[in-house]
Amino acid sequence: MNVFTTLQQFVPQQKISKVAGRLAASRHPWVKRTFIRSFAKAYDVSLDEYERQSLNAYESFNDFFTRELQDNARIIDASINGIVSPADGMISQLGQIHDHKLLQAKGRDYDIGQLLADSADGDYFADGSFATVYLAPSNYHRVHMPFDGILTKTRYVPGTLFSVNNTTAANVPDLFARNERLVCLFDTAYGKAAVVMVGAMIVAGIETVATGKISRTDDIQEADHDMSFKKGDELGRFYLGSTAIVVLPKAAKTDWQDTMQHGSIVQMGQLLGSAKT
């Protein structure tokens, strides 16, 4: 483990994220203006594709960070069995789950049951497939549905808040199964499927259409749902972060596109692969 990741073990991750959340939610003119303008300059953020194209149009940094796209800014792949990217970002890893193990980085894997915080769900997806999409700070930070499905359960899993990037993925064991996350489970034409929204350092929160903003707790919290989504529908959003993981069962027989590999830049709605019903 390198110095950068080692230091993160000793900083007060939750407190830092809590303070960041308060500042990001502030509507004080000086606070929001300073944060928004500094961030936009640091990450060369363009508002050309967004509904509100002035930095002054946002009520807080959170409002800016979760800014909405213009209608038709993204094309949702319409192929019947197509699995699309849930977010703008970069493919961190994708492929098959082998005997409960997903690839995190070269030479490092982690357990699907630990990711989902449920051993029975882990067994169900033991030989399925997955795609991990990392959202960079400058990306559009809403998460959309990669397939049609009915949301049946959400599971909030408390955890650490390591930053998420190539360095931590390569150095922090079980990174995605250790960080705070929200597991969303769906009934689909392929059986049960999941979208996991993973938090990170300074991530101020996770919100979904079904749950509203998730309240942080010390215990796993589950809720049952019965909400239908179409591919491309908004599922939720990150306040300052991080990673979305799509998980499909073995029965889906997912065939990922040859062009999709580690480091591929993707947009929400772009075809990642195809499943079979």
From Swiss-Prot:
Obligatory cofactor(s): pyruvate
Source organism, top-level taxon: Bacteria
The EC number(s) this enzyme carries: 4.1.1.65
Catalytic center residues: 88 (charge relay system), 144 (charge relay system), 242 (charge relay system), 242 (schiff-base intermediate with substrate)
Quaternary structure and partners: Heterodimer of a large membrane-associated beta subunit and a small pyruvoyl-containing alpha subunit.
Family: Belongs to the phosphatidylserine decarboxylase family. PSD-B subfamily. Prokaryotic type I sub-subfamily.
UniProt-recorded name of the protein: Phosphatidylserine decarboxylase proenzyme
